[in-house]
């Protein structure tokens, strides 16, 4: 069900990050070197989740693994216990909550018209539903942290905090972000570009679907323009 996926990605997944933030308050802050294995595991987990996204053929699975990879960055940022890391983690949790929820909503819009979630079978929608293609483009740009979105601000904070703590982490972070851009582009091209493979009649988009996307994009844009609200 689409509602379950949206709530799971936007809220329940972030409860784990909130729990780690609360737990870190009772752990020693002066000796963060002892947390190095956990940080490496979090970043390596993010890379593996991103690589898993690249080989997905199911649209919902791809978006779900995308959420997992972003939470790896959040965990790494929280564990180093610096103000920048914590601010970046909180900002990324909020920004990615909106982004992944919007992507699940768009995936459901596609599924209702094609009755399949296989990427290769959902192509060609830019000719049929051009407005939906615009929403797909915006959601994917937010997913790859394009400026001036909140995702960009949060990933920049996380990258700065981790690089300041250990410069070697920039290799894993850079690799993770490169793969994120690759699968986001792959997802957009697979679902929107090319010629439609299904000959069934497609119903037009409803106002409620556009309203749902606007209610995802506008809060994220407002927070992007005034990040003091959460950072």
UniProtKB/Swiss-Prot annotation:
Entry's localization field: Mitochondrion membrane
InterPro entries, per database record: NADH_UbQ_OxRdtase, ND/Mrp_TM
Principal location: mitochondrion
GO cellular component, one term: mitochondrial membrane
Entry's transmembrane regions: 1-21, 34-54, 63-85, 89-111, 128-148, 156-176
E.C. numbers: 7.1.1.2
Keywords: Electron transport, Membrane, Mitochondrion, NAD, Respiratory chain, Translocase, Transmembrane, Transmembrane helix, Transport, Ubiquinone
Bilayer disposition of the protein: Multi-pass membrane protein
Cystines in this chain: none
Reactions mediated catalytically: a ubiquinone + NADH + 5 H(+)(in) = a ubiquinol + NAD(+) + 4 H(+)(out)
Sample GO molecular function, one term: NADH dehydrogenase (ubiquinone) activity
Single GO BP term: electron transport coupled proton transport
Physiological role: Core subunit of the mitochondrial membrane respiratory chain NADH dehydrogenase (Complex I) that is believed to belong to the minimal assembly required for catalysis. Complex I functions in the transfer of electrons from NADH to the respiratory chain. The immediate electron acceptor for the enzyme is believed to be ubiquinone.
The family this protein is said to belong to: Belongs to the complex I subunit 4 family.
Protein's UniProt name: NADH-ubiquinone oxidoreductase chain 4
């Amino acid at each position: 069900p689409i509602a379950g996926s949206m709530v799971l990605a936007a809220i329940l997944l972030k409860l784990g990050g909130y729990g780690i933030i609360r737990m870190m308050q009772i752990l020693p802050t002066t000796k963060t070197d002892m947390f190095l294995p956990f940080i490496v595991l979090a970043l390596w987990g993010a890379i593996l989740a991103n690589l898993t996204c690249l080989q997905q053929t199911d649209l919902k699975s791809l978006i779900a693994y995308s959420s997992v990879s972003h939470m790896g960055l959040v965990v790494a940022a929280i564990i180093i216990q610096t103000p920048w890391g914590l601010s970046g983690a909180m900002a990324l949790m909020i920004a990615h909550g909106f982004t992944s929820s919007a992507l699940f909503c768009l995936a459901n819009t596609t599924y209702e018209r094609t009755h399949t979630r296989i990427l290769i079978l959902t192509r060609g929608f830019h000719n049929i539903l051009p407005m939906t293609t615009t929403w797909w483009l915006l959601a994917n740009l937010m997913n790859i942290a394009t400026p001036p979105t909140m995702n960009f601000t949060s990933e920049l904070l996380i990258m700065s905090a981790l690089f300041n703590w250990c410069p070697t982490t920039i290799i894993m972070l850079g690799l993770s972000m490169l793969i994120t851009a690759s699968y986001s582009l792959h997802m957009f091209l697979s679902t929107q570009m090319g010629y439609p493979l299904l000959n069934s009649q497609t119903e037009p988009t409803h106002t409620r679907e556009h309203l749902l996307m606007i209610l995802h994009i506008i809060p994220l844009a407002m927070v992007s323009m005034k990040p003091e609200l959460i950072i």
